[in-house]
Amino acid sequence: MIYNGKKINFIDPAITNSLNPHKNSKGFCNAICPDQVCGTITKKNSKNISTNLNNRKNNPQNYDFDYDNIPEDNYIVFILESPHIEEFDTKNQIPIGPAQGNTGNNINIFLRDVIDGSPMFLTSLQMNFTYSLVLINAVQYQASQGTKPLDRKLTDENWINFWNENFKSDLIKRIKEIIKKSKDCKIINLCTFGHSGLHYFVNAELRVNGLSFYEGYHPSRNWAIPQRRKIW
């Protein structure tokens, strides 16, 4: 599917989101939320990590990830669940990008702490390498239907339906395209667990496709808890 002149996934454009606003929707949008480059992470030595994160609120389309034109680079890929209210300009019915709101704030605040608190992951990073940080949603549609407070049961049901229809295979295609063009690539599953174990859906699909990956807690609330700032 093409958006803003960029290939944002491998889904047939004929496959559309048929969801409508829910009675408790406070910010519904049925558009695709493209994956984006969030910034860079550099390992200068065994104990020195630097991060440089983008302000994606301004001209967010500039950061959309184009799967037709992937630079040869080093990548760290965060797999999230699905976009919610903050990820869209619902007034104009257009996407902003993944991990806005509390999720994005916690990535900005705690990213270095998370990496520093994950010895196995930190050791795996190449010395003096700069990695582009890519944020991708396993399901790029708003599974929550913009409900506020979040309707977890509804979100899980919609997410699983989207996952089984097309996003399961599409996620793997997206990740494989990034790996194909990367010098070094780290995949990290940060998808929420939800009430239905969504995190494990992603784990299983990565494993069955022979992809190496790390795991962690979703940043939205978990990274505010020191014990959950880790990748394993």
Over which residues does each language-model region extend?
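Intrinsically disordered, low-structural-confidence terminal and linker regions
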Residues: M1-K7
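A polyanion-binding, active-site-adjacent surface
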Residues: I8-I188
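An acidic- and aromatic-residue-enriched active-site/binding cleft used to recognize and process polar
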Residues: E81, A138, G194-H195, H218-P219
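Short catalytic/ligand-binding loop motif for oxyanion handling, primarily in non-cytosolic enzymes
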Residues: I85-F88, Q142-Q145, G197-F201, R221-P226
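Short, flexible loop segments at boundaries between secondary-structure elements
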Residues: R207-W232
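A charged, amphipathic interaction segment
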Residues: D170-G216
